[in-house]
């Protein structure tokens, strides 16, 4: 558990390096912090958007067709996706759903049977890549919204332990933080080869 947590923190540090440098560069050197008479305010809650497809790579997706009534994710934590495509493709194209027109819009049917759908799957679980290690890459995603699958259809289905967040219409490239390749022999991320996405745009 300690090793897993350490690797997760290391990957996050690698992928966040550019953001840290940008923040440092924006701070005037030698500037003293202004005194504050009032206590510091708490950090703002995760931004919420009326547009349920704000993250979508394909805006043609029709959320009104989604059944059952979806429970939308309202948190801002990092999500993860195992994928066989390398960053040279994903960083340029983002993640596109297989079929936003005629695919399976019913969330439960989509989850239980692998079939063309308007969704792109991600997970709350960083370590899920160890199950799908043959895919080769573990992508880090920072996108608004998405459907919390277990809260939508319950957590007793056979794939509940994947703690999935499904994105209707996929995920635009600007919401992908970066990627770590996976060693298929050891089922671990190759930390020295993690890459940050140059198109990533922090939004909160």
From Swiss-Prot:
It comes from the Bacteria. Residues 1-42 form the signal peptide. A motif (PN (phosphate-nicotinamide) loop) lies at residues 132-136. GO terms for cellular component: extracellular region. Changing residue 162 to E/N/S: No ADP-ribosylation of GDP. GDP binds at residues 111-114, 132-134, 159, 162. It is an enzyme of class 2 (transferase). Changing residue 159 to A: No ADP-ribosylation of GDP. Inhibited by NADH. As this is a secreted protein it will have to find its substrates extracellularly, probably from surrounding dead or damaged cells. As many bacteria use guanosine derivatives to respond to environmental changes, this enzyme may disregulate these responses. ADP-ribosylates the N2 amino group of guanosine, deoxyguanosine, GMP, dGMP, cGMP, GTP and dGTP; oligo-guanosine, oligo-deoxyguanosine and tRNA are ADP-ribosylated less efficiently, while dsDNA is a very poor substrate. Also acts on GDP. This is Guanine-specific ADP-ribosyl transferase. It comes from Streptomyces coelicolor (strain ATCC BAA-471 / A3(2) / M145).
């Amino acid at each position: 558990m300690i090793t897993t947590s350490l690797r997760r923190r290391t990957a996050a540090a690698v992928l966040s390096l550019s953001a840290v440098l940008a923040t440092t560069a924006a701070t005037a050197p030698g500037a003293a912090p202004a005194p504050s008479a009032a206590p510091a305010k708490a950090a703002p809650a995760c931004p919420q958007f009326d547009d349920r497809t704000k993250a979508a790579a394909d805006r043609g997706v029709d959320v009104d067709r989604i059944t059952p009534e979806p429970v939308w994710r309202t948190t801002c934590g990092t999500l993860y996706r195992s994928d066989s495509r390398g960053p040279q493709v994903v960083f340029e194209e983002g993640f596109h759903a297989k079929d936003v027109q005629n695919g399976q819009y019913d969330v439960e049917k989509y989850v239980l049977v692998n079939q063309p759908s308007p969704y792109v799957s991600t997970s709350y679980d960083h370590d899920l890549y160890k199950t799908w290690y043959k895919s080769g890459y573990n992508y880090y995603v920072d996108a608004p919204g998405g459907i919390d699958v277990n809260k939508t259809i319950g957590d007793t289905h056979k794939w509940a332990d994947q703690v999935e967040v499904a994105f209707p219409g996929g995920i635009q490239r600007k919401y992908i933080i970066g990627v770590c390749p996976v060693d298929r022999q050891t089922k671990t991320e190759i930390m020295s080869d993690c890459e940050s996405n140059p198109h990533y745009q922090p939004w909160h």
